[in-house]
Amino acid sequence: MTGSDISHILKEGELEKRSDNLLQFWKRKTCVLTTDSLNIYTDQQKKNKSKELKLQSIKKVDCVEHTGKFVYFTIVTTDNKEIDFRCSDEKNCWNAVIAIALVNFQNRKAIQGFKTQKESENTSLGQQERCMARAP
C-alpha cells in the first residue's frame, strides 16, 4: 500500500466492545471502518480516538454467535490478541463488513506485492540483456 492510497469510509456507527479489564463490561463505542482500518472512538463526535486497528494487523474475524438480542464476534490480531465486539441486530452488524474489508485489503496488498515482484524481475532482466549486448 502506498501513502497516496485514500481511505474510504465503508461503515460508520455504534458497536459495543468488551473491556480488557477484569470485569469485562460491554462499552458502547462509535466506530468508523475504512478501507485500511477500524477506528474506535470513545465519543460520538469522534474527537477522542481510543483505538485504531489497522487491517494489516487483523488476522481474521472469528467466533460469530447469534443470540436473540445480539450478534457477537471476535477480531483476532496478527499477534493473536482477541478483541470482542457485539452489535444489536443482524441487519446492522459489522462482522461481515469487517471481514469483507479485510479480504479486499489482503487482495490489494497481494496484487501490489505481485506488481512489485514483476517490476523487480523486469528490471533485473533488462539489466541482464544490456550486459549481454555489451559482451563481445
From Swiss-Prot:
InterPro entries: PH-like_dom_sf, PH_domain, PHLA1/2/3
Example GO biological process: positive regulation of apoptotic process
Key word Membrane present: yes
PROSITE patterns, A to Z: PH_DOMAIN (PS50003)
Topology in membrane: Peripheral membrane protein
Domain (PH): residue spans on this chain: 9-103
GO (cellular component) term, any one: cytoplasm
Short name of any one Pfam family annotated for the protein: PH
Compartment(s) of residence: Cytoplasm; Membrane
GO molecular function: phosphatidylinositol phosphate binding
Transmembrane parts of this sequence: none
Function: Plays a role in regulating placenta growth. May act via its PH domain that competes with other PH domain-containing proteins, thereby preventing their binding to membrane lipids.
Written domain comment of the UniProt record: The PH domain binds phosphoinositides with a broad specificity. It may compete with the PH domain of some other proteins, thereby interfering with their binding to phosphatidylinositol 4,5-bisphosphate (PIP2) and phosphatidylinositol 3,4,5-trisphosphate (PIP3).
Assigned protein family: Belongs to the PHLDA2 family.
Protein name: Pleckstrin homology-like domain family A member 2
Source organism per UniProt: Danio rerio
